[in-house]
Structures are given as C-alpha cells and as structure tokens.
C-alpha cells in the first residue's frame, strides 16, 4: 500500500531532529496510512493521534504518555494498544519500573480504558516518578543544547568527528545544530572541541540524516 515508515529518535543532529519531528506530526494530519517507529521521544512534544500503539513495556508514567498519543482525537471507537516485554534491564528503566509498568498493563484486562482511568490509577497507587528532563532542543530553540531524555549520566551531548571540518568554520552560536546525545559508555579518550563539546570519533560513530547516528560495529 506504499506505506513508508517514519523514523524518529533522539540520535539525530538537532537540525535533523526538528525535520523528523515535523515530518511525523504532519504525516498524522493527513488522511493517509502512516507508520512511525520511535523511541521514548514519542512521550514528549508529539502532538498526534494514532489508531494503533505497539510498545515495549516501560514505567507507568512513560506508558501513560505513550497511550496519550492513541486516539487523542476520538475516531468514533476505542483503539488497540499492544505491549511486549523489554528484555534489557537498566537504562532507561529499573526493574521496579518495568514491574510497575506490567502491573498497569494487567489492570486493563482487555477492557476499554480512558485517560481519566489511567490518571486515577497512578494517583491511587501513589507512584512517585522523577520528572523527565526538560526537552531543551524542542522548547528552547536551536541555540541551546540537547539535554538527555532520561536520568543524568545516560547520555552526553557531543559533536561528530565527520562534521568537524564544517563546524570549524561556524560561529559558536551555530554549533548546537550539529550536537546530538550519545551514550556515555566508551567515551574515554574522546577529544574535546574548542567549544567544550566532546567529539565522537568516526571510528566509533557514523551518521546519516535519514537514520541518525549509529555505532560502528554496534548492535
């Protein structure tokens, strides 16, 4: 049926993230089938209404944010949400977060659930969650920086070695357009740009505007 999936995650340069963000939002405004494949960034700042949600289990607050994109503009009937396990335990979720997420899912019992019911569930169980980091790259304009979407220490704002030649001719105020968050693992030995940003070596990280950053030899 000519369906072209849209990819949206945090490992794009700032300027490319803005383009992908707009493309996803605009696609859902059209009267055409659309498929968006996203990471946790879908929990924030995406003003869209989907008719099907397929998601890994997450913490309850995250699940409710994702469910908030389902049938946001009521289409005349309830829409389905499908959940599957996250086999990795650790960042960005602790084991207790995942267990609480499954507890939330089990309360649905294949029933029709409203946003009001989800909010009540959280209130009754008194689940305390840390607020997510401020989404600087969407709310603060491109002259700010890309803040982590989860707990501090999980990502670092960096530049890519493949961009350095181009970056060196820019004003410092323009550099954030080329920044992106990368995992803090394996950053030992990375050089710092004169602006203060770490530089991800090309032998470790490559980039394309359609797929984003990908780890060389990574999974």
What are the residue ranges of the model-derived segments?
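Conserved ATPase-coupling elements of RecA-like P-loop NTPase cores
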Residues: 46-49
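C-terminal helicase lobe and adjacent C-terminal extensions/tails of nucleic-acid helicase motors
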Residues: 1-25, 55-60, 64-219
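Conserved two-lobed SF2 helicase motor
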Residues: 27-43, 55
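Conserved phosphoryl-transfer motifs of two-component systems
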Residues: 52
């Amino acid at each position: 049926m000519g369906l072209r999936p849209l990819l949206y995650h945090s490992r794009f340069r700032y300027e490319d993230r803005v383009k992908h963000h707009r493309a996803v939002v605009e696609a859902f405004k059209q009267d055409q089938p659309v498929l968006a494949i996203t990471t946790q960034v879908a929990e924030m700042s995406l003003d869209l209404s989907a008719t099907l949600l397929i998601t890994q289990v997450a913490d309850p607050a995250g699940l409710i944010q994702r469910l908030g994109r389902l049938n946001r503009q009521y289409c005349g009937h309830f829409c389905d949400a499908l959940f599957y396990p996250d086999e990795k335990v650790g960042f960005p979720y602790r084991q207790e977060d995942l267990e609480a997420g499954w507890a939330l899912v089990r309360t649905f019992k294949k029933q029709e659930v409203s946003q009001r019911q989800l909010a009540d569930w959280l209130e009754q169980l008194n689940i305390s969650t840390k607020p997510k980091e401020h989404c600087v790259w969407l709310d603060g304009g491109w002259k700010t920086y890309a803040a982590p979407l989860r707990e501090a220490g999980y990502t670092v704002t960096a530049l890519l070695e493949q961009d350095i030649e181009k970056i060196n001719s820019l004003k410092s105020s323009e550099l954030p357009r080329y920044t992106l968050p990368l995992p803090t693992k394996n950053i030992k030995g990375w050089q710092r740009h004169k602006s203060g940003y770490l530089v991800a070596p090309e032998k470790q990280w490559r980039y394309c505007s359609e797929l984003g950053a990908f780890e060389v030899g990574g999974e």
